[in-house]
């Protein structure tokens, strides 16, 4: 290594003066480079101290109130060294005292022996402190320099560091000149040259550029020798790589090779989309296997969409992956749909915050062991297991979900899963549960008694198409912040028992399709529902074919604009009590009470008066809007007994109390 020294001279001062010379040395490790190195990297280092000949007037210190003084120093360093630098401090010799060389009695100002605040320094002593420290430390001898600073990366221009020399004097200090010298040594930290691949999206572009209409990549691996001169290559090294990395396609064996002098190749911090094959795109879609054994992933922070869409991969070995620094695994393995098994036991997920869609559409995976997953920092689990239709069991008992805010579509389409134990889930921060269990059509039990839904805003289609579930108890649900409940229970065709007694719907704006096609439920009490903010009730109770009673006694529909198909196909109902309903804003009544068959039982609709159809009339009667409002309701009669033999032809005008000269389908019940 080379050493650079800057020697600084001392000032000669008057009686009882203290002279402190600061010597400074800057040192950098000498790096040797072979002639084949592609991107020559040369480390540089510069440093300075602003006060190289500090002096103190001892008489002034002794005559001061506290008999103490502080001498500020500013150490400035500038280096491009990628591993940073180390700064040390020591005296010039083993002598750490400020000495009076003319004294016949050996007068001196000793170094403090332990860390102390300035005011507590012993008489006639000195020390140093660095940065924000409040204590002064002993002056180190030359043989035992003190490390005052160590960094891990290059500086951003000049980096300034504050130091202070402190001392305390007494009246018995012998007159004279007291001197010593401090040496600051700045050394660049050792730097090992490495090969680093370019950022993921750039790598992806270059990998795809190798393919032609006739030449497709089927294999990916490290080449043992450099490519022939005749081979068409692309560079995939990062700008900070110390080695050139070549990538090429050998049409003979359909293999994409990369070559670099080193055995190990570091992946970029951003390794997102490295092997991403977009939906509908044919580039790199034919890759059958990836040899990743020479990849070092210890510096990677982003692995989002890393292998996404590689639908022909049947095996993927990640056993050598170091993911200890990764924060983003969004869609990492999404749509690698031919995988049947994958071993993730080596993955360290302790820093991951986004794990959304990680296993999206792994439709052929039959086993998945996540017992080692640390999810304590994860905030996003949206779409995590979306479309894993062949998985029959999953154990999430080790999951820490205390920071998760998004669980949208988390288990969407896991249609072969019969049980799901979420008893360990902490959902106290979750805001989005929409589509969470959508189309889990084989699920027969679901216990959510531990769910804290106090922060949830969106429950759209949360249980949509969970068609094998017969009972669902949500009596613990806090829905006070929910704004969207549309299709929440849609197509739960086997549900016979539903407990929503705790539901607070005061902020809900959309209830369209909420209970649509809940075909086996016979009784539904929603008397506690507050619907003041709801604007859409379209298909809310559509095709509840076994429904016999429904209590909507406190429904406020003043802001509703869409009531289309609201009670359509509810063929087991004999009467509807809609006395709380008003319709000043409704624009669409299409199919509201319609049935697709004349085999239905509805005979009476009770209201407190005629309905306002002015908005609907303005909107017009254009299919499907405002048409077939009472289709096939052949048993329905109005207040005075009026009915129509052709209910399909009855229009909006029948949304009124039946009376002489004004026939209608409503019966007055004040």
Identify what each model region corresponds to.
Residues 191-670:
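Negatively charged
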Residues 19, 24, 35-37, 45, ...:
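N-terminal cationic amphipathic segment used for targeting or macromolecule association
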Residues 38-192:
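Signature of Gram-negative chaperone-usher
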Residues 1-40:
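Sec-dependent, cleavable N-terminal signal peptides
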Residues 23, 34, 47, 113, ...:
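Residue-level recognition of conserved structural "scaffold" positions that shape functional pockets
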Residues 7-8, 12, 42, 71, ...:
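Intrinsic-disorder/low-complexity coil detector
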């Amino acid at each position: 290594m080379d050493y650079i020294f800057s020697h600084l001279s001392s000032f000669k001062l008057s009686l009882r003066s203290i002279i402190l010379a600061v010597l400074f040395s800057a040192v950098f490790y000498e790096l040797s480079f072979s002639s084949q190195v592609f991107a020559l990297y040369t480390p540089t280092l510069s440093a300075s101290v602003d006060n190289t000949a500090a002096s103190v007037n001892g008489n002034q210190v002794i005559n001061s109130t506290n008999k103490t003084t502080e001498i500020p120093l500013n150490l400035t360093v500038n280096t491009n060294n990628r591993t940073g630098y180390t700064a040390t401090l020591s005296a010039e010799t083993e002598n750490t005292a400020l000495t009076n060389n003319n004294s016949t009695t050996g007068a001196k100002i000793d170094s403090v022996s332990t860390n102390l605040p300035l005011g507590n320094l012993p008489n006639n002593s000195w020390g140093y402190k660095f940065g924000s420290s409040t204590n002064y430390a002993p002056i180190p001898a030359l043989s035992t320099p003190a490390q005052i600073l160590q960094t891990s990366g290059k500086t951003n221009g000049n980096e300034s560091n504050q130091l202070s020399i402190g001392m305390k004097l007494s009246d018995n200090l012998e007159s004279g000149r007291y001197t010593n010298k401090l040496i600051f040594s700045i050394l660049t930290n050792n730097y090992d040259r490495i090969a680093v691949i370019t950022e993921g999206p750039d790598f992806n572009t270059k990998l795809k550029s190798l393919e032609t209409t006739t030449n497709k990549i089927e294999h990916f691996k490290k080449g043992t020798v450099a490519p022939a001169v005749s081979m068409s290559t692309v560079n995939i090294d990062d700008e900070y790589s110390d080695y050139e990395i070549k990538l090429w396609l050998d049409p003979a064996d359909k293999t994409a090779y990369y070559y670099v002098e080193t055995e190990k190749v570091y992946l970029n911090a951003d390794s997102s989309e490295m092997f991403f094959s977009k939906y509908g795109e044919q580039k790199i879609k034919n890759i059958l296997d990836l040899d990743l054994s020479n990849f070092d992933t210890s510096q990677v922070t982003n692995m989002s969409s890393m292998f996404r869409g590689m639908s022909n991969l049947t095996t993927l070995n990640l056993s050598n992956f170091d993911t200890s620094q990764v924060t983003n695994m969004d869609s990492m393995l999404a749509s690698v749909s031919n995988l049947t098994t994958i071993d993730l036991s080596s993955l360290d997920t302790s820093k991951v915050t986004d794990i959304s869609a990680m296993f999206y559409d792994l439709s052929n995976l039959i086993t998945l062991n996540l017992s080692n997953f640390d999810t304590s920092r994860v905030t996003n689990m949206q779409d995590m297991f979306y479309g894993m239709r062949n998985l029959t069991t999953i154990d999430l008992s080790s999951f820490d979900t205390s920071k998760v805010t998004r669980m949208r579509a988390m288990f969407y389409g896991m249609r072969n899963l019969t049980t799901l134990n979420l008893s360990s889930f902490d959902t106290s921060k979750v805001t989005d549960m929409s589509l969470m269990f959508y189309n889990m059509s084989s699920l027969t039990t679901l216990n959510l008694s531990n769910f804290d839904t106090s922060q949830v805003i969106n429950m759209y289609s949360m249980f949509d198409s969970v068609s094998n579930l017969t009972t669902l108890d949500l009596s613990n649900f806090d829905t006070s912040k929910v704004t969207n409940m549309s299709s929440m229970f849609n197509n739960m065709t086997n549900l016979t028992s539903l407990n929503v007694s705790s539901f607070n719907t005061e902020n809900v704006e959309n209830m369209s399709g909420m209970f649509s096609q809940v075909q086996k439920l016979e009784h539904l009490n929603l008397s506690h529902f507050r619907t003041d903010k709801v604007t859409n009730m379209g298909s809310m109770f559509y095709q509840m074919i076994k429904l016999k009673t429904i209590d909507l006694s406190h429904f406020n529909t003043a802001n509703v604009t869409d009531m289309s198909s609201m009670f359509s196909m509810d063929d087991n109902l004999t009467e509807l009590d809609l006395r709380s309903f008003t319709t000043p804003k409704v624009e669409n009544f299409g199919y509201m009470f319609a049935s697709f068959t004349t085999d239905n039982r509805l005979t009476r609709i009770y209201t407190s008066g005629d309905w306002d159809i002015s908005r609907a009339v303005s909107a017009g009667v254009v299919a499907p809007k405002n048409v077939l409002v009472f289709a096939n309701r052949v048993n329905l009669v109005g207040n005075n007994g009026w009915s129509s033999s052709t209910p399909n032809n009855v229009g909006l005008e029948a949304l009124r109390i039946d009376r002489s000269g004004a026939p209608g389908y409503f019966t007055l019940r004040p």
